[in-house]
């Protein structure tokens, strides 16, 4: 078992990162590079043993050595209690489960930030609602979101992201801990709702962009889809009380463009496979990692229907993923819609 032992010095831990996938690991590496002591917790003992033995994540982040101040752990209780600040980086479909497991070990002063992008499965609820239900309202909450690929972040390539929380002191502290003037810029944002929504919707639109390219429609179609996808994202956000300008920032347009245009994106590659004639199961198997956008599509579709917000791109992607519609037919149906005003 990879755990902090009695010999492990876990005083002065700056942050505990919960989730040792590629993105959680890359964030933990970035934090530790700033000179802070950071715990990276994961629940799979074999995986964590391998990370500790290699002092790297050779499967998904090859060639990126762990900083000496990065500590591996599978002990959830010690990991949670060692730091006031927790950064949750797990898939959205297990977000509530992980928080429920964390709750018994929280300190009175614990603050929780998440970099998970998505909504609650089967309900489409924002993750803030899930967090409050799991943890109560006595802990500060924050969301970290923006255009980041794990490999580039871990490699120290220049990256910018945003953080939002109702607790302004928490935002300031997170900026201090995460921001690195050389490679990693962190912007403060006041829109807690919009910051949560952008990361979920962009995953769905990225699948659509991949489908478009897989069919062979070219750059014009991809750009139109991104632009109209941004309009759908903004409409839903405003209906939920978010600020429209948030979606022109890091967690909206920034993340959307990145995910729709680069093949490092699992969601885009998933869509490419579908556009080229693959089915959902074979496309997911081809990716080999969690494709958040698959679940996000149903979640966003549920939320849009509940709010009465028209999202025709999301509707067509939902029909492809969950109702067996052919991607080419979905594209034709989008193009055949009645003439509309752009606004």
From Swiss-Prot:
The keyword Lipid metabolism applies. It catalyses: sn-glycerol 3-phosphate + NAD(+) = dihydroxyacetone phosphate + NADH + H(+); sn-glycerol 3-phosphate + NADP(+) = dihydroxyacetone phosphate + NADPH + H(+). The active site is at residue 202. It is found in: Cytoplasm. Sn-glycerol 3-phosphate binds at residues 117, 146, 148, 202, 255, 265-267. InterPro entries: 6-PGluconate_DH-like_C_sf (IPR008927), 6PGD_dom2 (IPR013328), G3P_DH_NAD-dep (IPR006168), G3P_DH_NAD-dep_C (IPR006109), G3P_DH_NAD-dep_N (IPR011128), NAD(P)-bd_dom_sf (IPR036291). GO terms for cellular component: cytosol. Its EC number is 1.1.1.94. GO terms for biological process: carbohydrate metabolic process; glycerol-3-phosphate biosynthetic process; glycerol-3-phosphate catabolic process; glycerophospholipid biosynthetic process. Keywords: Cytoplasm, Lipid biosynthesis, Lipid metabolism, NAD, NADP, Nucleotide-binding, Oxidoreductase, Phospholipid biosynthesis, Phospholipid metabolism. Pathway: Membrane lipid metabolism; glycerophospholipid metabolism. The keyword Transferase does not apply. NADPH binds at residues 22-23, 43, 117, 150, 266, 290, 292. GO terms for molecular function: glycerol-3-phosphate dehydrogenase [NAD(P)+] activity; NAD binding. It comes from the Bacteria. HAMAP family: NAD_Glyc3P_dehydrog. Catalyzes the reduction of the glycolytic intermediate dihydroxyacetone phosphate (DHAP) to sn-glycerol 3-phosphate (G3P), the key precursor for phospholipid synthesis. Belongs to the NAD-dependent glycerol-3-phosphate dehydrogenase family. This is Glycerol-3-phosphate dehydrogenase [NAD(P)+]. It comes from Aliivibrio fischeri (strain ATCC 700601 / ES114) (Vibrio fischeri). The lineage of its organism: Bacteria, Pseudomonadati, Pseudomonadota, Gammaproteobacteria, Vibrionales.
């Amino acid at each position: 078992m990879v755990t902090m032992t009695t010999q492990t010095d876990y005083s002065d831990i700056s942050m505990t990162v919960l989730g040792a996938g590629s993105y959680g690991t890359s964030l933990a590496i970035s934090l530790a590079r700033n000179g802070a002591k950071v715990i990276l917790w994961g629940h799979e003992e074999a995986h964590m043993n391998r990370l500790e033995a290699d002092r790297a994540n050779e499967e998904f982040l090859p060639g990126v050595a762990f900083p000496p101040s990065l500590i591996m752990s599978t002990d959830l209780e010690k990991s949670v209690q060692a730091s006031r600040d927790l950064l949750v980086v797990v898939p959205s479909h297990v977000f509530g489960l992980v928080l429920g497991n964390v709750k018994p070990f929280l300190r009175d002063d614990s603050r929780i930030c998440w970099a998970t992008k998505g909504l609650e499965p089967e309900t489409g609820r924002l993750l803030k609602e899930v967090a409050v239900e799991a943890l109560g309202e006595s802990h500060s909450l924050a969301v970290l979101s923006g255009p980041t690929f794990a490999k580039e972040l871990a490699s120290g390539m220049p990256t910018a992201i945003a953080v939002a929380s109702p607790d302004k002191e928490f935002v300031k502290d997170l900026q201090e801990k995460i921001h690195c003037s050389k490679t990693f810029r962190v912007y403060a944002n006041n829109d807690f709702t919009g910051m949560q929504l952008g990361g979920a919707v962009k995953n769905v639109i990225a699948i659509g962009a991949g489908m478009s390219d897989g069919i062979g429609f070219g750059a014009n179609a991809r750009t139109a889809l991104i632009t109209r996808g941004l309009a759908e994202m903004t409409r839903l956000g405003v209906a939920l009380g978010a600020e429209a300008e948030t979606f022109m920032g890091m967690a909206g347009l920034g993340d959307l463009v990145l995910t729709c245009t680069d093949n490092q994106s699992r969601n885009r590659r998933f869509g490419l496979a579908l556009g080229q004639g693959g089915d959902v199961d074979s496309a997911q198997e081809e990716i080999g990692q969690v494709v958040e956008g698959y679940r996000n599509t149903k979640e966003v579709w549920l939320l849009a229907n509940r709010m009465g917000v028209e999202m025709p791109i999301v509707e067509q992607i939902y029909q492809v993923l969950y109702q067996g519609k052919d991607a080419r037919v979905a594209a034709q149906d989008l193009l055949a819609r009645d003439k509309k005003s752009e606004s």
